[in-house]
Amino acid sequence: MSVITIQCRLFSEEESLLYLWELMTQKNTPLINELLELIGKHPELEEWIQKGKLPTGLVKTLCNSLKTDLRFSGQPGRFYSSAITLVDYIYKSWIALQQRRERQISRKERWLSMLKSDAELEKDCNCSLDVIRAKATEVLTQIATPSDLHYNQPTENKKGKKSKKGKADKAHGKLFSLLFDAYENTTDPLERCSLAYLLKNGCQISELEEDPEKFATRRRAKEIEIERLKEQLNSRLPKGRNLTGEKSIEALETATHNVPKNEDEAKAGQATLLRKSTSVPFPVGYETNEDLTWFKNDQGRICVRFNGLSEHTFEIWCDQRQLHLFQRFLEDQQTKRDSKNQHSSSLFTLRAARICWLKRQGKGLMWNKYRLILYCSLDTRLLTEQGTQQVISEKAAKIAKILTLTKDKEELDDKQQAFVKRQQSTLDRINTPFLRPSKPLYQGQSSILIGVSLGLKKAATVAVVDAKQDRVLTYRSVKQLLGENYKLLNRQRQVSARHSHERHKAQKQKKPNQFKESELGQYLDRLLALEIIAIAKTYQAGSIVLPKLGDMREIITSEVQARAEQKIPGYKEGQKKYAKQYRVSVHRWSYGRLIECIQSLAAKTGIAIEVGQQPIRGSPQEKARDLALSAYSSRITSMN
């Protein structure tokens, strides 16, 4: 993606700020709350969850029915559109999470149904363990290929470290899938038990006697995972923002006068009381770039007016580094006006915008305690002449395809004819490009990838991989990436540890425990991102591969557990204590913020971003390498 987001403060007269504050807090946010509640109470919600989406036009229909309600009437049209888009997005995300949890539960329950002790396997097939092992050896020879068997036995290099770990993990995963499919498809008791024996022992024949306590702990751990997922599956529906605090008061009255019927109801009531309500209204989004009108006032300041709020003018207060971008927004719109609409707004640098309130330190009225912020999304390719030509080519090809498909239809209704006319007009006008400065586009080699692995001890580790040659060009640790600034990382760890200790003491004394973090972590993220982009330019990398954030909890948990088992083998309580101390000693990193910094700088440079699943096992260097190779392999597979 080549889209980045910038922000600025909007300054205006107090009357304008008051009007916008009341409109967003008393009209728009209550409307969004009502829409969320209506969908949550709909009798067909479970059916929509199974389908994976809400019916097309449902949110819009509900919103239209509420427009006549005095509580929500009198808003600009764009405010209603923003509410519809936001509610649809919230439920789309929530339904996706619910479906993911259901899939996880299904997979774990399948595994749990197969996971049996050696004694249970002997009883199911009425055979001894030696017979099961012999059958397992036979099945393994039939199903596994020679390469699978080879990689199933880890080899060691001269230094005693396991080699070809990435290939071994891949081969092991393939063999595991084959064995599990065979288990699902066979009905022979002995064969099923032998397959179950192989699967629970990591696709190998174990010569050791099974420890009943360890097996019981392993099975119970999986049961707990399923129970936790089911609790999350039954979690509360999406709720709005409680700006007035009325719901908190209602929950307090309920808890005062009613005794909980069971433990679950008590937990739910406690969670409601402890939940910190926000006093910030929902943002308002402007999805089209012509909803904003740019101009300069008498003092020469750049100002903006919004569609539906044309009587109110807002000055742009921004950083000097971003001023030229807002100047570009103004120039684009001025160019189109001067040319009498011979230019197309589809080539405006600005793509979309959003206004919201941001809390700040201050006293007085609510609209003075909060700053009005404007977020603008822009396409970095439209900042240069070469990038604009690239966008024109893409849009022209897309419109030509649409027109070809539409013209193949024999009869078109009035809406379709108007749509064809608009597309043809856009196609004619995009050939009149805006004046842009010339700057060569970044040209990287598609076979060279930058893999970035994230971890608890090592925040970021980089591997530059030539996937076509299947070799690593270089590695970079977090210490090498930061260079002389590595000492700042130690300072960040000390600050984080101190805040953690102070927060723990405040919680025990039931005092406020929200300690404001410094911007040192954000500064370190920017330094890491800058160095990663510099490495990509040096090696002419075609893309940067980042791990999925959804996998970070499992990755970090696995990393801590592996370290604990290595330090204190065979002692569970000691491992738990060590893991807790280890988490305190290392930093708590904002991986999402780091990824955003890398994505933003990559978009400005023109380097593609790919997302993959980071391996759980291996060193940080091996994880970064395997992440890049996996992304390249997936890319080749999708192309074929």
Describe the residue ranges of each PLM region.
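Nucleic-acid substrate recognition interfaces
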Residues: M1-I450, L454-N640
